[in-house]
C-alpha cells in the first residue's frame, strides 16, 4: 500500500494548526490524521490524532467529506472543510467557534 502524507495549515483567531493525513492515497476515509499546532494566546501546544468526518450514505458508506474530528477527553475538535473550527465539550456544550483560513 502506498502511504501518502499530505498536510494543510489552518489559522484561526486562537489557533495555528497543521493537519496531516497519514493514509494511503485514494482512501475515502482516514483514521490517521494528525493535528499539531499552538494556541496563539497561551502558547500551549496542541497535538491530537483524529479522523476524517463524512456524511453517511443510505447504504452506510461514507458520502460527502465534511472535514476532520479529533477527540481529547471530553472535548471534540471539529474542523470543517470551510475552515470553521468548533470545540465542543460533551454532546452540545460549544466552547469555541471560529472561522479560520486554510493556507498552502
Please place each PLM-identified region on the residue numbering.
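Cysteine-centric segments in proteins
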Residues: 3-104
